[in-house]
Amino acid sequence: MAQIKIEIAYAYPERYYLKKLTVEEGTMIQTAILQSGILQQFTEIDLRENKVGIFSRPAKLTDQLKDGDRIEIYRPLLADPKEIRRKRAEQQAAQAKKK
């Protein structure tokens, strides 16, 4: 089988991890992540919980990789976006009443 080149990315707000790998054509996302060693380096990653994607598009762990793909492992959201918007609207309403 042919070899393909891929990247695996995992980011924090202040820094990011990017690893280049060569894998067999047809390798699944999960297999590439396991081969990369990222799970040992970042023990907070749980593939049952963390979502993954290819170039910002959601992907499944069983999806096959193509040459040049960048696997992105997403961190869980710290806060619910709907809840943040609701709180912001409440704060703005409270400030408007004070004026």
UniProtKB/Swiss-Prot annotation:
InterPro entries assigned: Mopterin_synth/thiamin_S_b, RnfH, RnfH_sf
Domain of life: Bacteria
Pfam family, one: Ub-RnfH
Family: Belongs to the UPF0125 (RnfH) family.
Protein name: UPF0125 protein PM0166
